Amino acid sequence: MNMIERVQQEWFSNIRGDLLSGLVVALALIPEAIAFSIIAGVDPRVGLYASFCIAVVIAFTGGRPGMISAATGAMALLMVTLVRDHGLEYLLAATMLCGVLQIAAGFLKLGSLMRFVSRSVVTGFVNALAILIFMAQLPELTNVTWHVYAMTAGGLAIIYLFPYVPAIGRVIPSPLVCILVLTALAMVVGLDIRTVSDMGELPDTLPVFLWPEVPLTLETLMIIFPYSAGLAVVGLLESMMTATIVDDLTDTSSDKNRECKGQGIANIGSGLLGGMAGCAMIGQSVINVKSGGRTRLSCLIAGVALLLLVVFLSDWVGQIPMAALVAVMVMVSIGTFSWDSIRNLKKHPLSTNIVMVSTVAVVVATHNLAYGVLVGVLLAALFFANKIGHFLYVSSEQEASGRERTYKVVGQVFFSSSDKFVGSFDFKEAVDKVVIDLARAHFWDITAVAALDKVVIKLRREGAEVEVRGLNEASATIVDRFGVHDKPEAVDQLMDH
């Protein structure tokens, strides 16, 4: 595929769907950007400018067309202490350093590490985010009049029923119809309900380039680096997970390492325009895909429309009832949750269910995506090690003379299976020679090598001649490097201890 064809496919292959979905996303981004600014303890314009800049930049630099990136709650939570103790300028500097670290991660190809995240962890991550998205709407549904419940229910009805309207149901995104209808209804009837303008003051000027006013000293670096590192890790985790989810929704693939670099460039740009750090947003990405967005154009439209709406149409945007946006986000929550993971609980292995539920529990309890993913990956690794450790078989046969025994090892020898490997040998049997056939085995780590050393040395101590044969190239390399059973000096030193 040449450059012109690639540009056509990534930008202009779905123009109508991208324009409409981008507008829906822009409207949904506004209250969230304001809310995340409040969480971080900064002016609402910081979150709005960040969402504009990140969405526009990532449209050009990202590795996952159709995925929406902007200011997020997960990132905002990490900024609270920095803003409180040092102020906005240090936040902008930390945002830029976060971008540098993410670009470095892209060049180091850390995005490829996503292949080590199991499907059960991704499912747990998705379900946890769906729960968090729903929980985030509860304050808008608590201690309110019945009008809010009625409008939210009406909004959900529009979202789910409008697609069945002949001719136009599949042309216009139902979330956009929901927002427009409920806004018009609230303005005509004059309902006293919370609107976007109640979330905070919308900016009336375009963002301008500025350099953070912080001293360029080692002390400043020591202050911002821990926050920048945390932001970079959480941002990349959420972005990589979201990219995987959008891959599944669209049956396409993405360039994870390019996405790392793109997120970094976007965050540097955000910091230079007075915005906070951000990353991919699973909720908005799902809205975009469900509304028909597929290419980079949808993300660009979302960012540009966001800025135009808040700067030039703030009076109209401010009248959007929060109930309409709550309805949209509830739809996102329902659509994001993997209901198959609940229906198939009895069919899936217990280990898979434990990993999924643990990931959900940790993310929901801590509101920290990184903790949940870390726990999920560690549990998945432990279960895998335990499972693969059982796939080790050692058989033996004795020659007719009774003076020689051959042990045939089949499977993986590593820290989890090393005890089973050692326990498979009879060290007290009176034989002249023992052959250990490793042609169908693989040694993975120094624990496995130490187990082989232990077996060979104990057999030789009992007076048997030991021959190790059949090691594959990779196993032979690690055994030659770390093994001591064929190194007399090392064996003597080991025995002395």
What are these regions (language model features)?
Residues 140-141, 183-186, 232, 399, ...:
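Glycine-rich loops and low-complexity Gly/Arg-rich segments
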Residues 1-16, 194-210, 391-408, 463-497:
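Intrinsically disordered, low-complexity non-transmembrane regions of multi-pass membrane transporters
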Residues 335-485:
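The feature marks cytosolic C-terminal regulatory regions of anion transporters and related permeases
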Residues 3-5, 298-316, 427-448, 490-497:
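Contiguous hydrophobic segments
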Residues 1-383, 387-392:
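Transmembrane helical cores of multi-pass ion-transport proteins
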